[in-house]
Swiss-Prot record:
Family of the protein in this entry: Belongs to the universal ribosomal protein uS15 family.
Any single biological process term in GO: translation
Subunit relationships: Part of the 30S ribosomal subunit. Forms a bridge to the 50S subunit in the 70S ribosome, contacting the 23S rRNA.
GO MF assignments: rRNA binding; structural constituent of ribosome
NCBIfam families referenced in this protein's UniProt entry, alphabetically: S15_bact (TIGR00952)
Protein's UniProt keywords contain Transcription: no
The encoding gene: rpsO
HAMAP family from the UniProt entry: Ribosomal_uS15_B (MF_01343_B)
Organism: Serratia proteamaculans (strain 568)
The protein's name in its UniProt record: Small ribosomal subunit protein uS15
CDD domains: Ribosomal_S15p_S13e (cd00353)
Stated role: One of the primary rRNA binding proteins, it binds directly to 16S rRNA where it helps nucleate assembly of the platform of the 30S subunit by binding and bridging several RNA helices of the 16S rRNA.
Length: 89
């Protein structure tokens, strides 16, 4: 259910500040968004998979916390990130 190594590397390259930047808030939010989108497709087929749904809610909560942190620290980076990811906030 996780992302492939190539998909993660592409996200890190697109959103990171450097080639090995996997810890910045932008990269973490982008990785969580990709995993959340993947799980949403999973739940269209497996409606009763409550164990994975709990993991999805945990990921959504973590993404919200990271976005709130980024908004508090640097509003310009926050707005550009939500536009690039297509989030509604």
């Amino acid at each position: 259910m996780s992302l492939s190594v190539e998909a993660k590397a592409k996200i890190v390259a697109d959103f990171g500040r450097g080639t090995n930047d996997s810890g910045s808030s932008e990269v973490q939010v982008a990785l969580l968004t990709a995993q959340i989108n993947h799980l949403q497709g999973h739940f269209s087929e497996h409606k009763k998979d409550h164990h994975s749904r709990r993991g999805l809610l945990r990921m959504v909560s973590q993404r919200r916390k990271l976005l709130d942190y980024l908004k508090r620290k640097d509003v310009a980076r926050y707005t550009s990130l939500i536009e690039r990811l297509g989030l509604r906030r």
